[in-house]
Amino acid sequence: MLSLCSTSSLGMVATTTATQKFDARRLAGVSYPLGFFDPLGFTKGASKGKVKFYREAELKHGRVAMLASLGFVVGENFHPMWGGELDLPSAIAFQETPLQDWMPGLALLFAIHEFSSIWTFNSPFGGELWSIRSDYASGDLGWDPLGFKPKDPAALKEMQTKEINNGRLAMIAIVGMVGQELATGQTLF
């Protein structure tokens, strides 16, 4: 949140780019069975920078949801902390753990990551507000120590499509897991 509020005050050099429509159907993530999926029309008439902003947000949310889904399953089956006594639904267990000591550190980690993403935005001074620079590839953190990123553009697009689709599924899955636990009051696994 801090990075979103400070983006306008910490913007890069002013640019004067004209807003041009961009065809989002060419991006990774367009695949069978849904094809291009934008039911609310966010990308209709949007510029390339704005579409990249939406894609960046989708990737971040998808990555967090993939980790949350895994953490949900592991957390309900493995209880090494706090004496292993908290075998409760996640919504209740979260309130029973002494997380107040962890929250400032966790908030700091999120703030550092979000602060670093400020430099991916176009400047709001003369540029388009809430859009990503044209030289930045959405989701590319510039860190691939194991060399998983394919060199071939077709293979890269295929891998990006898999990540987008897995992230979309994970976002739906974590909402379903939390919803089911809240509705039944019991653990899932």
Q: What does each model-found stretch correspond to?
A:
Residues L4-F189:
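Alpha-helical transmembrane segments and their helix-helix packing motifs
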